[in-house]
Amino acid sequence: MKYYELDNILTKKAHYNFVIGERSNGKTTALLRHIVRDYYESGRRGAIIRQMEEDIKGHKGASLFSGMIEGGMIDELTDGKYQGVKYFNRAYYLGKQDEMDQWTYEKEPFAHIFALSQSLHYKSNSYPNVGTIMFDEFMRHDHVYLVDEVSLFLNLVSTIVREKDIATIFLVANTVSWNSPYFKTFGLKNVSQMKPGDLATVEFKRKRPTGVEIATTIAIEYCENTAEYGGKASDVYFNVDDVRVTDMITDGSFAVANYPKCPHHFTAKNVKLTCWILTDETILRCRLMKVGREVFFFVDSIKRFVKLPGETIGTMQPDWERYEAIRDKRRDLTYSLEFSSDPTHFTNPTMPYADRRTRWLPEALRANRIFFESNEAGEELMYYIALATKRSVAAL
């Protein structure tokens, strides 16, 4: 089996590096190895971020480097100088064992670990000379994120780096979804089009009021799947029909649900109501249909494929021109995360509002009378609902 290595993405020299791929292919270990080696060679420390406090407490925090210790990697990466790691007070210390089996640990840590949910508590602390920041498992299959999570993450990065620019930041996750608030923030709009082995970059350039231009580079790598190199020995345990999960584990396919497809043929005459769900990256058309005695919603995505000169991977983008051409401004309902006084504008499609027409979509969701053009349309709707349930003035 071939484990993941950072060699390809490091050639991009990006400020932010997204690494996604199948489970247990060595993504996290590759970053931990990089942190240890970089500290040994340059003295630059590592910073490891997890979403929740429970992810770093007790045994979970203490066992992070256990596999590397057992595999002799600490000894290998430090040319035999250190053999172990001690976890104390949310920091990691390299240690060596003498001939009498006595352990001695460094006084200064080589890495710190943080819980994003507790990020406000770190503001007054100092974390000098951090060269690598790793956010492990930044993406969740259940779409459950902290309120304003990306802002919390950026604030924590600010706390760690302070005024320096020596840190390289990595965000690592299994391919559980192609929808993530981090992809949106960092301009990664082509994730659903990527294939294992793809490596792409995005560059942001902005001018400060002083006229000085700042350029930030973002790279994303979709790891090659281990099946190309014989796979993992553990693949025998996942040779079952639950393709949604097993393919993510064995070959890195996105763990996307198989959403129900429409069993009926319909025409424009069958459409009784159209609801639009809008974000910067998504236009979903949800049409209430009546076919015979059956009433249901059909959801499709209004997009177009765009491939700019020099791009290796094209992007599916919302087709706003088509949206403006086909929507009925007087009759259609609109859902978005924006605040609006428009009486036909709403936020949460799972809630009925004063307008009686808004009861149809929540009822269809509860009764499972909803069908989708594609799995991607289903994922986009579920992701929007997860965001909309937290959207209110009180949550700002």
Name what the model sees in each region:
Residues 1-396:
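Phosphate/NTP-binding elements of NTP-utilizing enzymes
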